[in-house]
C-alpha cells in the first residue's frame, strides 16, 4: 500500500500540487491521466522518492518494496542483460553478490561461514534460487530470446534496451510498481503480454500512459490530475470519461437552475423591498438568496487538437 497525505509542490510561482490525499491499495491498477505538463511524471517521482515534496508526505507499507521503470538506456552498458533484470530487486542483488564474494575468500574463516549462512537464508526467503529463471521468463515474455540474455547492454539497440528495463521493473514481484509510459517502443505482442502480466499482478500498479486502449484493458481505477488536484474514479479510462462528463453536465445543470432561482429572487426583492406589505417577504427572499452558492466549475486544463479550415471567400453558385 502507498499513501499520500497532504502532498504539495510548487515550482517558482507555479503550484503543481496542493493538498493531495490518496491511498493506493493492493490488487488495483491506477491509471494516472492529465494534460501534458500537468505533472504526471513529477508525481511518480514524488511517489518513488526521487523528488522531495515541499508539503505532506508519501508512506510505503512497512517492509514493502517499490519498483520503478527506469528511462536511462545507457546506465548498464557493461552489465549482462540477465543481470540488469535481477538488479531490479536491489536487496536480492546485493545479497547475491555479497555471498558470492564471501565464498571466493581465501582463507575462508569461521566468521565468513556464519555470515554466508545468514545470507543464504535471506537469499532463500527472497526466492533467490529461482531469480535467474524468473528474469529469463520475463525477458522471453517481452520477446527477448535467450541468445540475448548473456550479452552486454551496450551491445543492444535501444528497442531491446527498453524491454530489458521494463523486465527489470517487473522483476521480483514488487509490492508497488510505478510505470511511466511502459508501452513506448513496444511492439504489439509485447504490449499484449504486458497487459496480461498487469491484469494478473496481485499488488499495486500506478501507470502513466497516453494509450487509452492500454488503460482500458488494465486499470481498475483512474486518477485524474487537473489543477493540482487528483480525483479518483473507480473503473477504466472509458468509465472515467463518461463519469466525468456526466458529473460536469450535472454541475452545469445545477448551476443553471440556481441562476434562474437567483434571478427570480432578485426580481422579487427589487420589486417589493420598498412595499410595506411585502417587505417581510422581500427580507425572507434575501435570506434565501444569500444561501444560494454556485458550484465552482473550472474548465479542464486539457487541450484537444483540432484542424480548422477557413475559406478565403465563399464558393460561387455557378460552375464554369
Segments predicted by a language model, with ranges:
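ABC ATP-binding cassette signature C-motif
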Residues: 1-255, 312-320
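Flexible nucleotide-interacting loop at or near the entrance of a catalytic core
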Residues: 113-130, 246-320
Amino acid at each position: 500500500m502507498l499513501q499520500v497525505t497532504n502532498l504539495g509542490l510548487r515550482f517558482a510561482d507555479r503550484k503543481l500540487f496542493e493538498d493531495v490525499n490518496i491511498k493506493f491499495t493492493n490488487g488495483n491498477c491506477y491509471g494516472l491521466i492529465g494534460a501534458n505538463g500537468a505533472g504526471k511524471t513529477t508525481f511518480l517521482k514524488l511517489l518513488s522518492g526521487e523528488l522531495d515534496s515541499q508539503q505532506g508526505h508519501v508512506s510505503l507499507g512497512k517492509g514493502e518494496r517499490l519498483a520503478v521503470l527506469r528511462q536511462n538506456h545507457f546506465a548498464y552498458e557493461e552489465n549482462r542483460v540477465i543481470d540488469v533484470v535481477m538488479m531490479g530487486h536491489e536487496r536480492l542483488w546485493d545479497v547475491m553478490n555479497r555471498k558470492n564474494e564471501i565464498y571466493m575468500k581465501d582463507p575462508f574463516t569461521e566468521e565468513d561461514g556464519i555470515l554466508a549462512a545468514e545470507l543464504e537464508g535471506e537469499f532463500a526467503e527472497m526466492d533467490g534460487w529461482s531469480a535467474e529463471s524468473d528474469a529469463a521468463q520475463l525477458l522471453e515474455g517481452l520477446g527477448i530470446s535467450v541468445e540475448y540474455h548473456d550479452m552486454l547492454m551496450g551491445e543492444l539497440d535501444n528497442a531491446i534496451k527498453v524491454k530489458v528495463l521494463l523486465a527489470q521493473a517487473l522483476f521480483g514481484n514488487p509490492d508497488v510498481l510505478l510505470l511511466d509510459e511502459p508501452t513506448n517502443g513496444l511492439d504489439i505482442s509485447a504490449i499484449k503480454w504486458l497487459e496480461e502480466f498487469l491484469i494478473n499482478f496481485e499488488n499495486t500498479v500506478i501507470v502513466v500512459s497516453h494509450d487509452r486502449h492500454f488503460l482500458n484493458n488494465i486499470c481498475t481505477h483512474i486518477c485524474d490530475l487537473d489543477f493540482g488536484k487528483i480525483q479518483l474514479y473507480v473503473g477504466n479510462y472509458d468509465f472515467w470519461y463518461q463519469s466525468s462528463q456526466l458529473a460536469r453536465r450535472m454541475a452545469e445543470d445545477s448551476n443553471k437552475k440556481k441562476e434562474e432561482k437567483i434571478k427570480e429572487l432578485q426580481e422579487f426583492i427589487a420589486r417589493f423591498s420598498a412595499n410595506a406589505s411585502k417587505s417581510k417577504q422581500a427580507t425572507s427572499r434575501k435570506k434565501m438568496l444569500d444561501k444560494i452558492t454556485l458550484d465552482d466549475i473550472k474548465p479542464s486544463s486539457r487541450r484537444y487538437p483540432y484542424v480548422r479550415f477557413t475559406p478565403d471567400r465563399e464558393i460561387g453558385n455557378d460552375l464554369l
